[in-house]
Amino acid sequence: MRIGILGYGRFGRALASLLREAGHPHQAWDPTAEIPGECRAAGPEGLVAACEALVLAVPIPALAGALGQVRPFLRPEQLVFDVGSVKVGPCALLDAHLGAAIPHAGTHPLFGPVSLARAERPLRVVLCPSPLHPAAADRLESLFHSLGCEVLRQSPEDHDRVMATTHALTFFIAKGLLDVGAGAELPFTPPSFHAIAHTLESVQEDAGHLFAVLQNQNPFALGARVGLLEALSAIHQSLAEAVASGTEEQLAIPDLGTRSPVLQEARNHIDTLDQELVALLARRTELVLRAGRAKADMGLPIHDPERESAQLQARRAWAQEAGLDIQGVEDVFRAVLRASRAAQGK
């Protein structure tokens, strides 16, 4: 399928890389962004003329203007979709501008430039079909499957309700923590903060305009924020009351250890870590394949014994620093390297 990408910001570029890897020819147009010459369209009209499906990869506040810009050039056999993080408003705009004449649907890819660069998997997409064009949703689902994505169908309202209590609240909490200095360089942190620190890092790596969009464009975000603030206020007040009444134990967060034996808890954690290791190996394989394609473009051989030797030496040093069995860690990474060569067909 020939794809046109209107908007070549961080997500537009990331989507282009997925399309390239899947073998979908594509062009892009953006009035300000730098686009590789081989896929740069001459303008909006040329972009629309050359594609079978048009991706509106623009910020949500710019969506109405983008639709007005391309609408005169669209044809009934084409397919149009957006990729915004909010769906109620954008889906309504698609219906209003394109109506019954142009097939369309709303989508929200639950990944971005950072997760793609890290080769995080699985890739998931929420698809919001338009009642005017049920067949368009089927075409879009096939397209995303060809990119290696899992697809979940939701109404725009159901999507935004879930995003209000997950995506929007995550950014809201993260901004609060950053504003009180929790994201600054700290001399030490407990393990319980590590996941939060990762969240803060992820939020800071996202597009700067996304915070306001998630809070102000999602019709359910205000209610989610109010509910959270009320819950935090109640907890804050109950802390003082518990001290006065001597009932602080009632505020304790349920402890996993009180519900499962120590051995079972340890085994559960081991299983979870092993799942994470497998997911990391999948991500590593994706990066290895990406490196292999880059080598092929440069005319370099896939197998690089000198680099493998340096890798093993570095991993032995890491093992020593961590107090692990050096030979055991080397054996693990030799197996990883064998798997990498097998994935590359070498």
Q: What positions do the PLM features span?
A:
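Rossmann-like NAD(P)-binding element
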Residues: 45-74
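Rossmann-like NAD(P)(H) cofactor-binding subdomain of soluble oxidoreductases
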Residues: 64-116
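Interdomain hinge/lid region at the active-site interface
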Residues: 187-257
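NAD(P)+-binding Rossmann beta1-loop-alpha1 motif at the extreme N-terminus of oxidoreductases
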Residues: 1-46
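Internal alpha-helical scaffold of NAD(P)-dependent oxidoreductase catalytic cores
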Residues: 122-204
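Domain-level signature for soluble enzymes in the chorismate/prephenate branch of the shikimate pathway
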Residues: 86, 90, 137, 144, ...
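Short glycine-/small-residue-rich Rossmann-like dinucleotide-binding loops
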Residues: 58-60, 85, 130
